Every structure is written in structure tokens, then in C-alpha cells.
Swiss-Prot record:
Entry membrane topology: Single-pass membrane protein
Residue positions binding Zn(2+) 2: D269, H270, H425
Gene Ontology molecular-function annotations: N-acylphosphatidylethanolamine-specific phospholipase D activity; zinc ion binding
Binding-site residues for Zn(2+) 1, renumbered to this chain: H265, H267, H332
Gene3D superfamilies: Ribonuclease Z/Hydroxyacylglutathione hydrolase-like
Reaction equations catalysed: an N-acyl-1,2-diacyl-sn-glycero-3-phosphoethanolamine + H2O = an N-acylethanolamine + a 1,2-diacyl-sn-glycero-3-phosphate + H(+)
Transmembrane domains' residue ranges: 54-76
Keyword terms: Hydrolase, Lipid degradation, Lipid metabolism, Membrane, Metal-binding, Mitochondrion, Phospholipid degradation, Phospholipid metabolism, Transit peptide, Transmembrane, Transmembrane helix, Zinc
Keyword Transcription regulation (UniProt): no
Full protein name: N-acyl-phosphatidylethanolamine-hydrolyzing phospholipase D, mitochondrial
Originating species: Saccharomyces cerevisiae (strain ATCC 204508 / S288c) (Baker's yeast)
Length: 468
């Protein structure tokens, strides 16, 4: 009996130990798998270290040469500016006045290493570091631009009108229009007209319709001019990029066919792909662009293109009337990507008729203390209408070399002795830090303080205005 009991107890004990052993094996890490992971991690560590090393080398191989390039460009530009200032000062100190030759010496296009640079003392070169640093700062801004969420409130703040365009253009069907051919030729310096006394030609009214940003439709004496065309809801692509914050006053298909399209530079908010596609091919308007932009235009199907460099003048003849369009300097930059930065020039434009300044389109520019005085001395004072940008100036440390604020708009108005000024380049996209209505409010407040609020203000979208 004792033997049987002992045997049973021994079997029970062995069974319990066997069960415990099996349970422990269920939770015991697999030796082969853990060993494999350990060996795998040991193999990947050198690869990770190597990839980090190559990433650092690649980053340094880009940043170091670019920093050296930017440093060289800055030094070369400053050297050229000093040389030009010295030569201009010697030339003009005997005359005690601003001369056209001095303007050519001081403010002719400047190229460094195959790219255009600004020949202005007021300009500070923008590097890639600054550009992307400002983009990072923008990520932390809340409700940038102060855009109201309520659509009805936005419509009250930014009313949109249906354009009437100008005399006899309300009922015109753009699809049925055929543009009259223009006779054009670039003039040499000896044949460029200078300012003369007022005559019948300068008494024709100017009709202007602001379509957003720097896009304006201007009619003068039957000549139709479109500036910096922009008819897209997004800047970069049809569905990408900063979105338009206001309604478009007119679709591109509703715009009466212009005779001339002026493009101040190739930034996406001054030239969109939709305009290139719509006004290309045969019977397209005459595109007038800065030097270096023609190849981009032709690659997008626009063949009726003429390039102008600073101080060059194009003679245009329509209906036996002769007009002159001159490209004048501006302080800005160009580029639609990082690779083509400053490969083409940027400029402003001045339309003259019978030697009198009619329309000044600034495009984008910073303020230069004697530039606009020199433009006035060359082409005459009393410009009927100056279209000047007044937005995108915050933060000032970043924007000031390339954009003007409302105070500087008034300075340019005084320098040009312009009769009327419209503040544009605001209220269309959020591209800077100021409240979206601030440019309008500041400009009109300063103009009222100066006693000329009826001659200097911001237009309403789509509203066609007449300037005698």
C-alpha cells in the first residue's frame, strides 16, 4: 500500500513539474529569434551611421558653396554700386542736376555670374537661408492676415463690382474680337521722346479697372493694356499654393481682348499659367516682358513677345496714333523656382503719348531715394495715373528691400509728381504678416492727412474708374 501511494505521489509530482516546465517555455524568449535581432541591429548600426555621415556631407557640400557664392555676389554687387555712384557723381557734379547719362551709369542692369542683381544702395540680398527662415516663422502665425471667416463680412469689407472696362466695352464679346495688328519697334536712344508741353493727346481720360493684386485693365485713347495678368484662384498650381481671399471680379473669358500685356516680372502673383494659355498662339496680344523672360514665354506657347531692358523704349502704333512704352528700373527680384532666381530682369513700365507720361505701372519694387526722380526727369512730370503696390511689407526686416509700404507710396507719388495714384498689390492673397486691410487704411489715412485723398487711394475690385 505504501509502495502504491508513493508511486502515485511520484507520478503526480512529475506531472506538475512537466506542466510548470511547459508554462515557462511559453513565456521564455526564443533564443534563436533574439539572437537574430541582436545580430541584425549590430549590422544596421554601421549603415545608419554611414547614412547620417553622407547626409551631413551632402548638406555641407550644398551649404558651404552656396554661402561662398552669396558672399561673393554681395561683395561684387557692393563694389559695382560704389563704382557707379562715383562715376555718376563725377558726371553730375558739374551740372548740379540729375542727368539721363547719370541715370544710365547708376541704374543700368547689373549682372553677376550670369544672374541679375540690384544696383541700389538700399537693397539687401536675400539668401535662401532668409527665405526659408521667414517661411518657418509664418507657420507659427495664427489667422495670418486677419481674414474674417464669415463670407458676408468679407464681402462688406471687400466689395466686388462688375467691370465696365471703358468706353464702348460693356457689351463686347471677347470671343468674337479680333485684335488689330500693332506696328512696333524698339527705339534707340537718339529717337526716344522726352517730355514736352501738354497738348491734345494728353487730355484723353484714362480708364482703369483693378482685378486684384497688380492686375489692372487700362484703356487710354482706345489702347487697351493689361498689367501683370492673374486670373487663378491659387498661385503655384490650379489647386496648390496661397488661395485667393477675395472673389475675382471677372473670369478671364469675360475680359475684352487687350492690345498689350505688360509683365513686370515672372513671379506667380504677377503672371499665372492660365493667362499664358488663354492669350497665346495666333492673334494673341503683344506681350511686353523684361529682358530674359522671352524663352519662358515661348516655351508656354506665347510667340508675340518683345523683351525690354531698363531704359529701353518700344514705339507702338495703333489707329495712326503713336505711343511709347518704356521699361524703367525697379528694386525687386525674379524667379518661379530656386533654379531660375534672377535669371530674368524685373522692371516697371511707363506709357507716354506725345511725350507726356500717361500710365506708370510699378509692378513690385522697394523704395530708392533718387530712382523715381530720375524717371520723372527723363520722361516728364504729371503722370496721369500711377499704379503703385502698397501691400506685402511685413515683416519689414524681410520685405523692405523688395516692397514699399503706404508711406513710401506717397514718396513715389511726390518723386514722380503723379496726378493720381492707385494703391494695388493688396487684398488678394495673404503673402505677408500685416492685416489684409491695413495697406488700404494706412494709405488713405495718410493721403487724407496730406490733403489729396481724392487723388491717392485704394480702388475697389472690378470698379472701372475714370481719370481725366
Amino acid at each position: 500500500m505504501n509502495f502504491v501511494t508513493c508511486h502515485v505521489q511520484m507520478r503526480l509530482l512529475l506531472q506538475r513539474r512537466l506542466v510548470r516546465l511547459r508554462e515557462s517555455e511559453l513565456f521564455r524568449p526564443q533564443t534563436s529569434l533574439s539572437t537574430f535581432k541582436r545580430h541584425a541591429s549590430q549590422k544596421t548600426r554601421p549603415i545608419q551611421k554611414c547614412s547620417r555621415k553622407y547626409a551631413r556631407i551632402l548638406l555641407l557640400s550644398v551649404l558651404v558653396p552656396y554661402t561662398g557664392y552669396a558672399f561673393y555676389v554681395s561683395l561684387a554687387t557692393v563694389k559695382q554700386i560704389d563704382l557707379r555712384n562715383e562715376m555718376c557723381q563725377r558726371l553730375e557734379e558739374n551740372n548740379n542736376e540729375v542727368t539721363y547719362k547719370g541715370s544710365l551709369l547708376k541704374y543700368s542692369p547689373l549682372e553677376v555670374l550670369g544672374r541679375f542683381e540690384n544696383p541700389f544702395e538700399e537693397y539687401r540680398i536675400q539668401t535662401v537661408f532668409e527665405f526659408f527662415a521667414n517661411r518657418v516663422f509664418e507657420l507659427f502665425e495664427r489667422n495670418r492676415g486677419g481674414i474674417p471667416r464669415d463670407v458676408h463680412q468679407m464681402n462688406k469689407l471687400m466689395p466686388v463690382h462688375k467691370p465696365t472696362w471703358g468706353p464702348n466695352l460693356v457689351d463686347v464679346d471677347p470671343a468674337e474680337e479680333t485684335a488689330l495688328p500693332l506696328e512696333c519697334k524698339v527705339l534707340d536712344e537718339l529717337h526716344i521722346p522726352t517730355a514736352v508741353e501738354e497738348n491734345e493727346g494728353s487730355k484723353c481720360p484714362v480708364y482703369n479697372t483693378w482685378l486684384g493684386q497688380s492686375c489692372n485693365y487700362t484703356v487710354y485713347n482706345g489702347l487697351r493694356i493689361l498689367t501683370d495678368p492673374l486670373f487663378s484662384d491659387f498661385l503655384i498650381h490650379k489647386t496648390l499654393g496661397p488661395k485667393r481671399i477675395t472673389q475675382m471680379p471677372s473670369q478671364i473669358t469675360e475680359v475684352p481682348k487687350p492690345d498689350i500685356i505688360l509683365v513686370s516680372h515672372n513671379h506667380p502673383d504677377h503672371l499665372d499659367l492660365e493667362s499664358l494659355e488663354y492669350w497665346s498662339g495666333k492673334d494673341s496680344p503683344l506681350w511686353i516682358v523684361p529682358k530674359g523672360m522671352k524663352s519662358y514665354m515661348t516655351s508656354n506657347g506665347c510667340d508675340n513677345v518683345l523683351e525690354l531692358s531698363w531704359w529701353e523704349t518700344l514705339q507702338v502704333k495703333k489707329n495712326n496714333e503713336i505711343y511709347h512704352i518704356s521699361a524703367t528700373p525697379a528694386m525687386h527680384w525674379s524667379g518661379r523656382s530656386l533654379l531660375d532666381t534672377n535669371k530674368s530682369l524685373w522692371c516697371s513700365f511707363l506709357l507716354t503719348h506725345h511725350g507726356n507720361p500717361i500710365l506708370f505701372h510699378a509692378g513690385d519694387t522697394g523704395y530708392v531715394k533718387d530712382l523715381f526722380v530720375r524717371i520723372k526727369e527723363r520722361f516728364g512730370k504729371g503722370c496721369k495715373l500711377a499704379l503703385l503696390p502698397c501691400g506685402q511689407y511685413c515683416p519689414e526686416w524681410h520685405q523692405k528691400p523688395r516692397h514699399i509700404n503706404p508711406q513710401e507710396v506717397l514718396k513715389i507719388m511726390k518723386d514722380l509728381e503723379a496726378r493720381n495714384v492707385l494703391g494695388v498689390h493688396w487684398g488678394t492673397f495673404v503673402l505677408s504678416g500685416e492685416y489684409f486691410l491695413e495697406p488700404k487704411e494706412k494709405l488713405e489715412m495718410l493721403a487724407e492727412w496730406g490733403g489729396f485723398k481724392d487723388r491717392c487711394y485704394c480702388p475697389e475690385l472690378g470698379k472701372t474708374e475714370c481719370f481725366d
